[in-house]
Amino acid sequence: MRKKIVVGNWKMNKTIAEAVELSSAIIDQLGEVSASCEVGIAPAFPALSGVHGVISGTGIHLAAQNCHYEDDGAFTGEVSVRMLDEAGCSYVIVGHSERRQYFGDTNPVVNLKVKKALSAGLNVILCVGETLDEREKGITTEVVTCQVKEGLEGVADIGDIVIAYEPVWAIGTGKTASSLQAQEVHASIRATVAGLYSEPAAAGVRIQYGGSVKPSNAEELFAMPDIDGGLIGGASLNAEDFVAIVKAAEKS
């Protein structure tokens, strides 16, 4: 039985003080973290230290939203995995569609980041997903399969990787893939992992859904056999909504 995982991606939202306040509210409303579901939050880089101080010892994981593939150097504005490790991160999100769209994170760049993060002992949330144009052309499976294969190129062990399927057309738009649409892609991703590694590895890898997950649709999504939790954007900025989604995952 795969353990569900729900991670809140706060993106470029919340000041340090606001992030500390939100993480405290999540702890207060969530109570003890259930053994049936991992929980993580990914604040913006400046808030990592403050949030880590709040969630340390609660069982909630600290995640980063991105990393660079070099240890150090002249890369203005970037953050290394060693810095993230020292800040208390246990997870890092790699290949989010907004990174791919706005910052030129190609599949080969994503692959370099995946391998660098793993080398530092971080768990990776590898994001994949198709655009609306790609879905309408009927090439969702081909696009996502390519992203998975190229993102995992040269990665010998998938044990420390979570895959997040995030249809780009459903991120921040209010649109959501139906539970059956999401399940179809998740099953395809699991089959791809089986081909790259093994059936046991595929059976064990957790695949999150990300794309306008809300308290109203979380339970239905998480009931699907290949959906193992969520990478939550907008709803994670509200403690009550985020905790409701976590509770839905715990029950599924």
UniProtKB/Swiss-Prot annotation:
GO molecular function, one term: triose-phosphate isomerase activity
InterPro entries: Aldolase_TIM, TIM_sf, TrioseP_Isoase_bac/euk, Triosephosphate_isomerase, Triosephosphate_isomerase_AS
Gene this chain is encoded by: tpiA
Organism, scientific name: Prosthecochloris aestuarii (strain DSM 271 / SK 413)
Catalytic activity: D-glyceraldehyde 3-phosphate = dihydroxyacetone phosphate
Keywords carried by this UniProt record: Cytoplasm, Gluconeogenesis, Glycolysis, Isomerase
Origin: domain of life: Bacteria
Enzyme class: isomerase
Record: residues binding substrate: 9-11, 172, 212, 233-234
PROSITE patterns, alphabetized: TIM_1, TIM_2
Record protein name field: Triosephosphate isomerase
Pathway assignment: Carbohydrate biosynthesis; gluconeogenesis; Carbohydrate degradation; glycolysis; D-glyceraldehyde 3-phosphate from glycerone phosphate: step 1/1
